[in-house]
Structure formats: structure tokens, C-alpha cells
């Protein structure tokens, strides 16, 4: 038994050391309708305080416990069900309630009651949330902010039970995204009107940047995502200009990634700062992992013959869980999961392309005199 343990230990140490010298690959686990997901277009992802993963799709809200899905859909016969199955955004408030944005209003899931209720509050301006919800997020004061198509921005203060509506009709009522920076400034991304900011909770709103040659930064652009970076900066995604970095200290804007390898514009849909030096970029053409230190990037795409690749190239949502695993929502492929890499093992498996393994059943392997590793499978021999 002792000798067996030593052999196994040496074996794993050897494999581990060799793996460190192998170029890193990214292996994803897919969850889709085949695994119980209600629908394959994942628009929104959230991990709640209990650890459940929530996935919002075009046909239902899903709660994943690591083994199976529980699906929530509109049921006209059940008054406790959600009132709309087309999910667009998710947010957990300070009380652990899940705010669910849909293509026609907002619903709140109360875990203790396991029931949904429509957020049918009337604002001081005599308006209600009736249209498609672009985004829901909270601020440090516990207020909930809701961007709604053609209705501008809503802000709900639960302590005062007060809802305010800011139509922003002088700019555009179509807010695509927003965020609060570390200093409390609210940044707004519009559909067709670029980037704006407010330092006084929307009492006044200003376009970002001083016009140069008659045009300001992001003017006329479709801003799809704004996130706070680690170095007092914002990362801004757009439809035609890829990803830009806005330095909040100097006010300077620089483009990080605008065109792909073929010279086409990058359509950015989501951004996720994974670490101090790594920015994940979800696009219509896969994922770019951008190194903020070296300005180099890795482009990940779906592959028909690679079962560990992304399941789809149209990436709609990126989310990092508390274990630092990444959840990737796509348009056709459901959700892909990439766990944190504590140790790295390279995988060799059939891909139906040149220089890949032939056959899944490895019967024997040995090292040749020239250092090549020979593997014998049930179908062929590889080296």
C-alpha cells in the first residue's frame, strides 16, 4: 500500500508539473434545456445570499442549486407566480428579496413566502413601470434604481415607500445601462445618445466630455455596459466601438479593444473585471479575455467539435460567483460555467480536427526515445 501511494503521488506530481508548461486552455461546462433550463437564451444571472444561482431567460426564471433547476413561469391560475416569463434583469436587495425585471414591468420574489408580487407602485409623477426593464441595481443607501425602456429611470426608497420617475425626455428615455462609481456619481449609457453622468441623483444630467471638432466622446453611440474598474476607472462597452476605459482622475478616454482579428467592429454586450489585470468581454463573437497590464487578449469562440468550448458565440451575460467561478449566458446555448482554476490540468480529447486525439478510450501510453508521448486508444495511436 505504501509503495502504491508513492507511485500515485509521483504520477500526479509529474502530470501537474508538465501541465504548468502547457499553454492554458479554457474548459467550460454547459447547462441548457437538456439539463432542465427553461429556455436557452440567458439574459441575466445572479447568485443570491444563500448561494443559489438565478438565471433569467426569454421563457422563465430558473433557480439552480448545483444539481437541478427549479423553474418559475407565469401561471394565470396561480396568483403567487411571476406575472411575466420574459426575464431581462435581476437584483437582490438588502433584505434578500429578488427583483426581477421583465419585458413588461418588475416583479419581486419573496423567499420566505416563495411567492412573486408585482411591483405596481405609482411614482410621485403618477407613472408606473410598464415597459421593458433594461437594468436593476442598488446604491449604498439601499435605494433600488430601475432603467425602463421609453420611461427613463425610476428610483425606489423602501424606507419611505417612495418611487420617483426621471423620464430624461430631454436626452432620451432609452437607458441601456448605468452604474455608480466609487465616488457616488451615477453614469448612464443611452441607446443612441452615448454617455451621461449625474452627481446629484438625476437632479441634473450632463453629457460626458468636451466637444472636440464638434463631437464629444461616445456621442450618438449605443452604450451597452458600464462597470467600475479597480484603478479608479470605468470600463465602457458599446455596439460599434468595442470597449473603452475612462480614467476618473484625469478624465481621459482610451479605447482598449475596438475591432476583431478580421477588422470587424466588436459588438460588446457585457463586461466583467475578473481580477486586477483581467477583463472579460462578452460580445456577439465570443469572449475576449483582455490583459489590462500587457494589452494582450485571448479570443474564445464556440467550436462545433469541441465539447468543452463555449456553447454559443453570442454572449449576453457574465457573472462571477463567490467562489470566483464564471457564469456565461448566451443567446442560443444556455449558460456555460468556468470554475476557478486552483490547479491546472490540460485535457486531450477528440475534436474532429487535425492534431487532436483519436478516440476517447486511452488504453496505454508510453514515452518514446525522442521524448514523444505515445498514446494508444481504442481507435488509433497518437503521439
Model-derived features with residue positions:
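A short, hydrophobic C-terminal helix/tail in secreted or cell-surface proteins
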Residues: 379-383
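Carboxylate-rich, polar loop motifs that coordinate divalent cations or form catalytic acidic clusters
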Residues: 1-378
Amino acid at each position: 500500500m505504501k509503495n502504491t501511494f508513492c507511485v500515485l503521488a509521483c504520477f500526479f506530481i509529474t502530470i501537474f508539473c508538465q501541465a504548468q508548461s502547457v499553454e492554458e486552455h479554457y474548459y467550460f461546462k454547459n447547462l441548457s434545456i437538456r439539463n432542465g433550463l427553461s429556455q436557452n437564451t440567458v439574459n441575466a444571472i445572479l447568485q443570491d445570499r444563500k448561494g443559489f444561482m438565478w438565471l433569467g431567460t426569454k421563457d422563465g426564471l430558473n433557480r439552480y442549486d448545483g444539481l437541478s433547476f427549479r423553474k418559475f413561469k407565469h401561471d394565470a391560475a396561480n396568483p403567487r407566480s411571476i406575472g411575466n416569463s420574459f426575464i431581462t434583469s435581476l437584483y437582490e436587495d438588502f433584505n434578500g428579496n429578488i427583483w426581477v425585471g421583465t419585458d413588461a414591468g418588475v416583479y419581486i420574489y419573496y423567499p420566505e413566502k416563495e411567492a412573486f408580487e408585482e411591483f405596481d407602485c405609482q411614482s410621485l409623477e403618477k407613472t408606473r413601470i410598464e415597459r421593458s426593464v433594461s437594468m436593476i441595481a442598488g446604491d449604498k443607501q439601499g435605494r433600488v434604481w430601475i432603467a425602463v425602456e421609453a420611461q427613463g429611470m425610476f428610483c425606489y426608497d423602501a424606507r419611505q415607500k417612495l418611487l420617483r420617475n426621471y423620464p430624461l425626455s430631454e436626452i432620451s428615455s432609452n437607458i441601456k445601462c448605468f452604474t455608480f462609481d466609487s465616488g457616488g456619481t451615477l453614469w448612464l449609457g443611452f441607446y443612441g445618445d452615448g454617455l451621461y453622468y449625474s452627481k446629484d441623483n438625476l437632479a441634473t444630467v450632463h453629457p460626458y466630455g468636451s466637444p472636440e471638432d464638434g463631437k464629444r466622446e461616445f456621442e450618438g453611440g449605443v452604450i451597452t455596459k458600464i462597470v467600475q474598474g479597480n484603478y479608479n476607472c470605468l470600463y465602457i462597452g458599446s455596439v460599434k466601438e468595442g470597449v473603452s476605459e475612462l480614467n476618473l482622475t484625469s478624465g481621459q478616454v482610451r479605447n482598449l479593444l475596438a475591432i476583431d482579428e478580421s477588422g470587424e467592429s466588436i459588438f460588446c454586450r457585457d463586461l466583467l473585471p475578473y481580477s486586477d489585470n483581467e477583463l472579460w468581454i462578452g460580445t456577439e463573437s465570443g469572449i475576449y479575455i483582455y490583459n489590462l497590464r500587457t494589452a494582450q487578449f485571448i479570443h474564445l469562440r464556440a467550436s462545433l467539435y469541441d465539447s468543452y468550448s463555449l456553447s454559443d458565440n453570442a454572449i449576453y451575460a457574465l457573472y462571477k460567483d463567490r467562489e470566483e467561478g464564471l457564469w456565461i449566458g448566451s443567446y442560443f446555448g444556455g449558460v456555460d460555467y468556468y470554475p476557478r482554476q486552483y490547479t491546472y490540468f490540460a485535457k486531450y480529447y477528440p475534436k474532429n480536427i487535425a492534431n487532436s486525439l483519436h478516440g476517447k478510450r486511452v488504453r496505454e501510453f508510453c514515452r518514446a526515445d525522442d521524448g514523444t508521448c505515445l498514446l494508444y486508444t481504442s481507435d488509433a495511436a497518437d503521439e
